[in-house]
Regions:
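Intrinsically disordered, low-complexity segments enriched in Ser/Pro/Gly/Ala and basic residues
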Residues: 3-5, 21, 48
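Detector for methionine-enriched segments
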Residues: 1, 24-25, 55, 68
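A short, charged, amphipathic alpha-helix used as a generic interaction element across diverse proteins
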Residues: 9, 20-43
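Short aromatic-glycine-(Arg/Gly/Cys) micro-motifs in beta-strand/loop hairpins
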Residues: 1-16
């Protein structure tokens, strides 16, 4: 099976998890469940990458700020 989508989790810039899946719906479902800064001290970054190389990023900060790109 080829893994074409990935969801990565970084806490304070350190990679803590990578999920690789072959279908878009599973990847999007996992990415939408990322809703806070988790166990990070300052911020958590979640990236969703698709087969074309496009990356969607959202970052949650301890102060409540959320940045999506």
């Amino acid at each position: 099976m080829e893994y074409t989508y990935s969801v990565t989790t970084l806490y304070d810039g350190e990679l803590v998890n990578t999920l690789r899946v072959s279908d878009m719906m599973t990847a999007v479902d996992a990415w939408t469940k990322c809703v806070d800064c988790g166990d990070a001290k300052e911020y958590a970054t979640y990236n969703l990458s698709d087969p074309t190389g496009k990356m969607y990023t959202k970052t949650f900060y301890r102060n409540g700020e959320v940045v999506m790109r």
